[in-house]
Amino acid sequence: MKYNDYLEHLELREGNEECVYLDSLGKPTCGVGHLLTERERQVYQVGDEVSEEQRNAWLEQDAAMAWEAAAQQIEDLGIETAEFIIVLGSVNFQLGTRWMDKFPSAYKALKNKDYDEAIRQVSTGSGKDGQSKWKEQTPVRVEDFVTAIDKLR
């Protein structure tokens, strides 16, 4: 079942932290990469432990939103490879469901089936050593996406 594979992939890449911590951008986060809302930040402070039940509820909500966005994007992109949704869902989970606003040229290249250009667009940029800031911060996540794009050929 693809959705369960997707959830396992998210937990593998994000971890499942029991306590609230600051992510690489300094934002309070907990569970499987859940960014705390303003309301949640009033309840939970950095270092606070959060119940497994609450963390699972956040995961269900966040993962479903990213999965739905990925499904719509796959349809828009005309991609028929079923496995691609796992990684594209992960991209939506990490970068947000409007990730293509951050990487418009990559999205356009995917739509045009120009996979070399899509890979270049997500890999290079204004970050350290000419790589994208996304790749600089989370190289394994970018490599997941690059590998999935490469398999579309």
Segments from the language model and where they lie:
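Substrate-binding/active-site groove segments that recognize
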Residues: L22-Y44
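Short, low-complexity, polar/charged sequence segments that are solvent-exposed and flexible
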Residues: T29, D48-E52, A109
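A residue-level signal for beta-strand positions that form part of recognition/binding surfaces
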Residues: L7, K27-T29, I85
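N-terminal hydrophobic or amphipathic segments with adjacent small-residue motifs
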Residues: H9, V20, L25-K27, S90, ...
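Long, amphipathic alpha-helical surface segments
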Residues: M1-E17, H34, N56-E60, W67, ...
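Alpha-helical segment that forms one wall of the substrate-binding/catalytic cleft
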Residues: V43-D76, A82-I86, N92-P104
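Structural recognition of the beta-strand scaffold that forms the well-ordered cores
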Residues: T29-G31, V87-S90, E117-Q121
